[in-house]
Amino acid sequence: MAYRLTTRRIGMAVFGVAVVAVAIAVQARQSNAVQGAAKVRGNVPGEWRYWGGDAWSTRYSALDQINASNFGSLEVAWQWSANPLGADEYYRTTPLYANGRLFTVATTRRVAAAIDPESGETLWMWRLNEGIRWQKAPRQFAGRGLAYWSDGPNERVIVVTPGYHLAALDAKTGIPDPKFGTNGVVDLMDGLGMPLVPLAVDDSGSLVISDAAPYRQARPGEAWDPVKKIGADGTIGIDPKFGQIANSSPAIVVNDVIVVGNSSIHGYYPIRVRNIPGFIRGFDARTGKQLWKFNLVPQPGEFGAETWQNGSKIGTEGVGKNDAWGTYAADPELDLVYIPVGMPLMDEYGGHRPGNNLFGNSIVAIDVKTGQRKWHFQMVHHDIWDYDTPMSPNLLDVTINGRPRKIVAQTTKQGWVYTFDRVTGEPIWPMPETPVLQSDVPGEKTSPTQPIPSRPAPYSHQGLTEADLIDYTPAIKDSALKLAKACRMGPYFIPASLADGSAPSGLKCSWYAPGASGGVNIDGGAAADPETGMLFVGGQSGLGTIVLQKDPCSEFRYSSPRDSCGLIGALPAPPGYVKREVGSGRSVAVTQIGGVPILKPKQMGGITGYDMTTGDKKWWLPNGGVMRQVTTESPLFAGVTLPPVPAIGGQPQVINTKTLMIYGTGRSGGAGGRRGGGGGAGAAGAAPAQPANQPQLYAIDKATGQQVATVRIPQVNTAVPMTFMHKGKQYIVFAYGQGSNTGLTALTLPAAPAGSRNGGSGDRQ
């Protein structure tokens, strides 16, 4: 009996050891799998080294210390104030976390800073004095973030400044790397084949954002006037006759190559056809040497030049824009970077640029070693809707119809997800070229077809047809139809009309949906779950109108309603010209009856969850998770119970973790930046008292779209959040604020009682 007992005990002991061994082996495999997957995406488990979380721009973290059971218990760990650094339109930056430090940029100066992730104290700050190039930079805001690079012993923070310089800073000290460029800085205006000249501030007339160059070439001997802040201060830059250049998004680092693009002037109200075109360049991450340059407006003789037909001007004397002003994604294993490209100049009229205008409105896959195009796909031909591509695509490895596929999914202003094999560029689901309405504006020649994705279903409303109008009673339908027929109608890609009704249609406006803000735009975009293949799109949906009118004081035959005459760089006004009131070309028609939108409410905008293994739409929820009842005193709606609509507009800003999809409502969702936090730059402090309409962060079940928890936050988030693990604690950090009151808020779980854990397995990664 003793023997048998001993045998049993030995057996149990051996079994117990086996269980432990199996558990350790499984845990090791899971840990290795997590680390391996993160490494493939260019990240380190528990870190956030790219604007989009990783090189694939998944906005995904495998952390789950913060989960459904404790999300509502999150509390403010610290707030970091950027107030002493200057003002900003609104704070649109997503920080990075790497090797124990948090990195951000702030304000129109684009000050780079390292922050202690535990206390919120500033470790270092850096700013480049750019003189006139900063003072008159066309896109001064905080640039959405920065980039990070490390080869092991060396760590660098990569900053693109408002005045268009590229800097490599020691991540530990903030000191520019003396081996990079000149004293740590590369002048990005150099290497473009355009002459650099002394610059001077131009004060010869009124200036409206995005109009002609805000500076000119300096005159011989011209001096700087520190009181009036005009004249020349020694700043060197591209000759202003070529136009304006800037940057509005961080670079991305792929296999020791820094990939950076440019922004041109806004296309709303340009005066000149000629402006700086878009391009992508690669720089050596160690030395700053320019390795290659890819032209997004093909130069004569290059692939795609034939898509700029007779009458189009390309080259340094040609049409501007086609700039890639958004964020980028990359596949380090394939040596490919995926570039979402904007549109050519100008936004609503293209009579000066006949043709499809490559590489405008395209996703372009570029080899980071050579700068050569691997493949491209143009999502909008000859854009006249301001449908530039504003956001990095999302990369996933999924199985479709039993076949492993490496895919790239591009969200757009158009309200569609365009999905491709990221190796070959082949569409995953058909995108047939579909006939669309043609422009009747003199001189305009629109594309006869546009590619329309068959899957996934759109996340934003497109166009306006009779079936889209409210029809709760015959009288309501008649009233809505009367309003709708005042403008040109159609299913999608409806071209602009002339404000004076002189075009053949006789109509004075055209419906515009989605509008210039999308769809998705700079504030929204998608997060991807590499474990399940789900894609979570934070978008918006709406209806507007678009018109054109003659523009005698610009080089364009037509433009959105405005008065160019008298602005810097404008052509002389014609004899007898009467000054016009400045208006908007994107919202000129009535879109409501008695406060009720004429468009039927649909499950669009908000957040849409897609299964990218099938292209199916799995769920939808409104921004903020709340619908509101529409009421009106209009007698037309007497006795009609109107369907609810989302209570919060705008674009949700989404990320996802191992168990949750987490989002903030964005600028539309609450008290904005009206209340601040912290004192000096980088000061950590307690959250101030909050108003009753305090904004929240939301936790969602990724599989079902059901809200599982919320937590109140001091200020509404104004950019995409991020998350990381530091010293065994998971944090969520987001930007807040506008004007002179901006900063970062960090949330974490309360300290656990001695001997207990906060929960979840994320603290082991």
Where are these regions (language model features)?
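Asp/Glu-centered strand-loop micro-motifs enriched in Gly/Pro and often flanked by an aromatic residue
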Residues: 61-103, 507-518
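N-terminal secretory signal peptides that target proteins for export/translocation
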Residues: 1-7
